[in-house]
Amino acid sequence: MEERAAVEYWGDYKVIAELGHGLWSRDVLAEHRFIKKRYILKILPSELSSSENFMRVFQEVIVQLAAIRHASLVAIENVSREGDRYFVVTEENGGTISLAQYLSGRKLSEEEVVHLIQQLCDALELVHSIGLAHGQIHLHSVHVSFFNGIANIYLPEVGFASLLRERMFSTIMQSGSARESITRIRDLLMFEAPEEQEVFGREADVYSVGVLAYYLLVGSFPWGSFPKPSLCMPDSWYDWDGFILSCLQQQREARPKCLREALRRKTSGEQLQVTLDSCREPLREMEIEDTPTELGPPSALIREGERLCEVKEEQHAFVLVEAKSIDEAMVTTVDSEEELESSEGYANPLQSLLAREPVVSRYVEVEREEIKPQPLLTEMIFIEGGEFSRGSGDGQRDELPVHNITLPGFFLDIHPVTNEQFVRFLECVGSEQDEHYNELIRLKDSRIQRRSGRLIIEPGYAKHPVVGVTWYGASSYACWIGKRLPSEAEWEVAASGGKLGLRYPTGEEIDKSKANFFSSDTTPVMSYPSSILGLYDMAGNVYEWCQDWYSYDFYESSALEPDAPLGPPQGVYRVLRGGCWKSLKDDLRCAHRHRNNPGAINSTYGFRCAKDVK
């Protein structure tokens, strides 16, 4: 944490307001210094940041949570570190309060309870689907947010509550009187499943949802021999008895496997059946009272139309077949037509019967086509062809001479390739090397990790540009997606606004509100304003690989052969353009040239793709 003129900073985030303390974090409202967007920072206390056991589990949980999005869950952008303290950057929300605060002096209608429990079940189903559980569902861990005056479920402690159970109880004992503390702990224990002995899984969450639903409906906990909701709410249209009692089963295996489906059945499809059943009983009594004691002959009850539809019984004939020996029946040579006629009715069926043998067909394994990951496509901008000027008299020697070139029209990605796009390519090829054993990417220098054979993106970095990628990796990805790398000439023309010949992609000047440079890390693509052509991140964020080999004096040759120049035929280095997140301002000029070995790996190197006009 850094102090500047009495203003509190955490990395690139300026603290605006305190929001309070949660179970595992101090929450503050902050604004990014450069992109001027507000976030909520969840700052871990020093004792948790220094705990290896907690941080190991914390990192695993954050990775999983960052991969999902739900209105009732914390939307994680990234995780950062300031000194020895970690903090989680999350999306700004409108503020929340605990369910206990919301219920204070308030009685919810049945429809409100259905709305809240449905949202809770939806969020938990998503959490359970990625192998996590909440672990501590109760009136203080479940929060509500408000939209247009309607309360909505919000779960700020998903995945962490069970890790900090002892910390929670210790905090409760240190605040308030002993009587208040014991009462609150008792209420918390009411939500815990009977089998819980450090086991906080899906089944425990289901049990807690049952307790919460009962409390919201009845206003008390289902303790001991408790009355069913139907007794407390005789006018209810919903089968709360079925849903709540199924959640509160003592055996874990007997509880619903899918909370959302169990709630849907009890509050929609089955409610009509229950209502019909309750209405059918009086009708049955009326039928019994009105039933006559003596009935007429059955024939009198047959309608005229039914007589016309009588089905005549089919008469079956009994046929006696003279038995013959098997040898006689199997004789295939016939002396006369009479013998043929007399025996074919018996011999042919018998031959067929005796010749019938079990047929075992050869097992042929059904070939199943392996489903490979499909690419995530990027929107492209068409750059119109024509004659352009490139080079600069204000830069380095390799930017001279300034000369005109001619290019055909081409397409260019609006932003660099991101981690979530590149990870699909790696999953498809199944390796970090190409067929010639060239490295495509070095994972330890990127935001992509391999754990237990699976590729995982660091939390919050899915939309950041991929880094640590070599020229071989960039070129292979472009080929896989049906595109190519842009030439150095194409890149400079696109960055400078075509025929406008701008100094920077943003215009004649540039500052930190327009690009990510001289900072501490990459930012998500498209975080800054686009260029005049609609391209993002052409300045800063990451250097971008180009197709060309680099030559110090290539512009001299290009001036003589100006039609679609594509660099020298061979070389040692490949061209990089655009500057990066830690570059100085001068490196962001459209004409600035950078280069490195095609196998070089750097946390500032990325790329974008181009495509010819067909």
Swiss-Prot record:
Alphabetical UniProt keywords: ATP-binding, Kinase, Nucleotide-binding, Transferase
Single Gene Ontology MF annotation: ATP binding
Binding-site list for ATP: 19-27, 42
Catalytic activity: L-seryl-[protein] + ATP = O-phospho-L-seryl-[protein] + ADP + H(+); L-threonyl-[protein] + ATP = O-phospho-L-threonyl-[protein] + ADP + H(+)
EC id: 2.7.11.1
InterPro entries, per the entry: CTDL_fold (IPR016187), Kinase-like_dom_sf (IPR011009), Prot_kinase_dom (IPR000719), Sulfatase_Mod_Factor_Kinase (IPR051043), SUMF_dom (IPR005532), SUMF_sf (IPR042095)
Induction section of the entry: Transcribed after 6 hours in infected mouse fibroblast cells, that is from the mid-phase of the developmental cycle.
Chain ranges of the Protein kinase domain: 13-276
Subunit structure: Interacts with PknD, interacts with and phosphorylates IncG.
PANTHER family: FORMYLGLYCINE-GENERATING ENZYME, SULFATASE MODIFYING FACTOR 1, 2
Functional note: Together with the serine/threonine kinase PknD, may play a role in specific interactions with host proteins during host intracellular growth. Autophosphorylates and phosphorylates IncG, an inclusion-membrane protein required for the modification of the nascent chlamydial inclusion.
Similarity-based family: Belongs to the protein kinase superfamily. Ser/Thr protein kinase family.
Protein name: Serine/threonine-protein kinase Pkn1
